[in-house]
Every structure is written in C-alpha cells, then in structure tokens.
C-alpha cells in the first residue's frame, strides 16, 4: 500500500534529518566549520523538502501519519544515533544511511508511479536529491589522491 510505504519514508527521513542535525550540533575537531555547515545543509534540505510533503501525501491518501518519535524509530529503515562519533564516522554513518534511503526510495517509486503521478514525481525528486547527498558524502570520505 502506497500510504504505508510513505509512512516508512517519513519516519526514515525524520530519523535521518535528526541524526544530521545531531551531528551538526555536536561535531568537533579538524575541519569543524566545513562539517558543521555541511551537516546543517543536509538536515535542512531533507527536513524542508521531505517531511511535510510526505506527511501531506499520506493524508491525501486518506491515511494518518505517524507522529511520535517512538513510531518513527519503529518504522525507520535506519537507526538513530545516541552517541557522538568522530567527524569521519559521522560522515560514514550518514553515507550508509543515505544509501539505505536511496534503496527505500527506489522501492517506493514503482508503486507510486503506478498509483499517483504526483507522488511519483516527489519520489523521483528525492532520489535525485539523495543521489547528490551520496556523491557529496562519498567525496568527503575519499582519501586525498597523491
């Protein structure tokens, strides 16, 4: 059911956004300003362009949105982070989570494409956005070429 898939997307996006925001607040060490800015842009982009739109699509499908942290944690395909890892590990974790997000979006797309073109367009936009996030995260993780 499309609404159920969107609930998983909503929960996963929320957990991803909160994790990036947590890292934005708590990152330390060398290159702090760059990490701080990047994590801030990442959580803002996901929050601003996914959360409310996804919830509204769920409601438009005559279903109710999950609305508690417990329910988001239960539905999400990624886990929350309760510790403060080193900056490099923050990036690696977000890269792994972003990859799972892309996989989820790719699972939802054919369902949406069959049932609702507006939602399919939204999912396609999110695939593109998370593809860009993946490129940036992967580039940060690469060792300098010599």
Mark where each language-model region is.
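Helix-loop segments that flank and shape redox-cofactor active sites
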Residues: 1, 16-42, 104-119
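Acidic/histidine-rich alpha-helical segments that form the ligand environment
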Residues: 5-6, 56, 74-128
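Glycine-rich anion/phosphate-binding loop at the beta-strand->alpha-helix junction
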Residues: 9
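Amphipathic, well-ordered alpha-helical segments in soluble domains
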Residues: 12-23, 49-50, 97-105, 133
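Leucine-rich amphipathic alpha-helices with coiled-coil/heptad-repeat character
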Residues: 27, 57-58, 65, 109-112, ...
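Conserved alpha-helical segments that form or flank metal/cofactor-binding pockets of metalloenzymes
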Residues: 31-69
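Short alpha-helical linear motifs
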Residues: 59-71, 94-97, 143-146
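Short, contiguous alpha-helical
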Residues: 120-146
């Amino acid at each position: 059911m499309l609404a159920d898939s969107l609930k998983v997307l909503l929960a996963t996006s929320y957990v991803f956004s909160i994790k990036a925001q947590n890292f934005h607040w708590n990152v330390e060490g060398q290159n702090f300003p760059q990490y701080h800015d990047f994590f801030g842009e990442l959580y803002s982009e996901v929050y601003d362009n996914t959360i409310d739109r996804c919830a509204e699509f769920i409601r438009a499908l005559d279903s109710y949105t999950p609305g508690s942290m417990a329910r988001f944690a239960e539905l999400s395909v990624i886990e929350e982070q309760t510790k403060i890892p080193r900056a490099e590990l923050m990036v690696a974790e977000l890269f792994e989570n972003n990859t799972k997000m892309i996989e989820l979006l790719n699972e939802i797309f054919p369902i949406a494409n069959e049932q609702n073109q507006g939602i399919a367009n939204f999912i396609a936009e999110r695939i593109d956005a998370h593809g860009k996030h993946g490129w940036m995260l992967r580039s940060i993780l690469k060792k300098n070429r010599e």
